[in-house]
């Protein structure tokens, strides 16, 4: 039962007037959703201003929406995901950022055993609407510690959805 899952709005585009890079489109989408949803919060590693995330996807959002809704977390991935799960179960809409896919492994148990199975384990009484933003691949030529593509591990987990932004 996905009745309480994220509803995707139908949007029609007449024409695209501005060309922007994908990370700026992500920033615009996050900003737009925060304007429409007072329960949405963003937190993670270096997401608040002035940095706005390692790739600047959240740049300007803590200034625009306040440090109560966009804030930095400790560099502790399991803590980020665990906190997001708890907040989602209490009607918040957390969007969390893990700086690089390579860093997600300390949180894998919570994603697999808690987040992904919440609806099933509660017989549809609970849902856990968490968005985990994770840059993947070799964009910065980071080698061993910044270039993993983790989607193959996560795509087989029932209870989660994987989305890649695209033009």
Stretch-by-stretch model annotation:
Residues 2-166:
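Thiamine diphosphate
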């Amino acid at each position: 039962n996905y009745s309480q899952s994220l509803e995707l709005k139908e949007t029609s585009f007449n024409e695209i007037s501005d060309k922007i890079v994908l990370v700026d489109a992500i920033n615009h989408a996050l900003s737009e959703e925060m304007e429409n949803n007072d329960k949405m919060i963003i937190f993670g590693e270096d997401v608040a201003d002035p940095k706005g995330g390692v790739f600047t996807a959240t740049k300007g959002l803590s200034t625009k929406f306040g440090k109560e809704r966009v804030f930095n977390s400790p560099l502790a991935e399991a803590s980020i995901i665990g906190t997001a799960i708890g907040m989602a179960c209490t009607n918040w809409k957390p969007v969390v950022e893990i700086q690089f896919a390579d860093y997600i492994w300390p949180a894998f148990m919570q994603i697999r055993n808690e987040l992904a199975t919440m609806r099933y384990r509660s017989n549809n009484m609970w849902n856990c609407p968490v968005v985990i933003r994770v840059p993947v691949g070799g964009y910065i030529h980071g080698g061993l510690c910044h270039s993993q593509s983790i989607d193959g591990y996560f795509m087989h987990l029932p209870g989660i959805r994987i989305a890649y932004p695209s033009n």
